């Protein structure tokens, strides 16, 4: 629920955590702390900034969850957390250096050097979602800029591009007259050789390739 600048998200997260705790029959004293990963800039102060997809300009996630759950809370950028997970138990096992790109509602990125996250001054050294790749874009990104990677290579971006192609091209595609278009539908259509879906995926690939 991202309404009202995402002010209900923390409560939903806390309720979900408590539900999982009850499901597993864990007592409070068995819970040492809580780790949360989130889009946006997760500062060392526990404040998440610039998580535009959640409606957060500056949300004190750590403080609010700590007060709500009465537990220690650690907040980490979602791409950094995913990269550490891959390094530990996934595709990065056995390596000390890696780059990871996450594609979902938005676009994230992380860099691991010598087994540690390259954070940079503000914790977002690996983030590529709001790099400008198409300077002639006329639609504004949620961040306020134009031509960001996320406008093309995210799930929302893929849907946006597909809708624009549906307006311009011969609508001989399985995607025509699809009221609730999803990224999965587009990708499935591309796998089946649908020309318009393939064109949309090509735009995604060019944007991501330019950023990398």
Positions of predicted regions on the chain:
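Short glycine-rich anion-binding loops that position phosphate/pyrophosphate groups of nucleotides
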Residues: 39-42, 104-106
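Glycine-rich phosphate-binding loop of actin/hexokinase-like ATP-binding domains
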Residues: 93-152
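Glycine-rich phosphate-binding loop and adjoining helix at the ATP-binding site
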Residues: 3-18, 22, 29-34, 40-99
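A mobile "lid/hinge" subdomain adjacent to the ATP/sugar-phosphate binding pocket shared
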Residues: 146, 150-212
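Active-site/binding-pocket entry motifs
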Residues: 40-42, 138, 164
């Amino acid at each position: 629920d991202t309404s009202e600048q995402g002010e209900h998200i923390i409560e939903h997260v806390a309720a979900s955590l408590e539900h999982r705790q009850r499901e597993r029959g864990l007592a409070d004293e068995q819970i040492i702390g809580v780790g949360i990963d989130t889009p946006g800039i997760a500062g060392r102060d526990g404040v998440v900034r610039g998580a535009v997809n959640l409606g957060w300009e500056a949300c004190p996630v750590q403080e609010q969850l700590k007060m709500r759950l009465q537990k220690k809370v650690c907040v980490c950028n979602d791409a950094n957390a995913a990269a550490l997970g891959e390094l530990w138990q996934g595709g990065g096992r056995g390596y000390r250096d890696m780059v990871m790109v996450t594609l979902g509602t938005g676009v994230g990125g992380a860099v691991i050097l010598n087994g540690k996250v390259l954070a940079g001054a503000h914790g977002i050294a690996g983030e590529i979602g709001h790099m400008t790749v198409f300077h002639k874009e006329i639609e504004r990104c949620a961040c306020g800029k134009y031509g960001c990677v996320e406008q093309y290579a995210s799930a929302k971006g893929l849907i946006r591009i597909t809708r624009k192609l549906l307006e311009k091209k011969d609508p001989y595609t399985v995607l025509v007259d699809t009221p609730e278009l999803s990224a999965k539908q587009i990708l499935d259509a591309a796998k089946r050789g649908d020309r318009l879906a393939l064109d949309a995926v090509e735009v995604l690939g060019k944007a991501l390739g330019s950023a990398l």
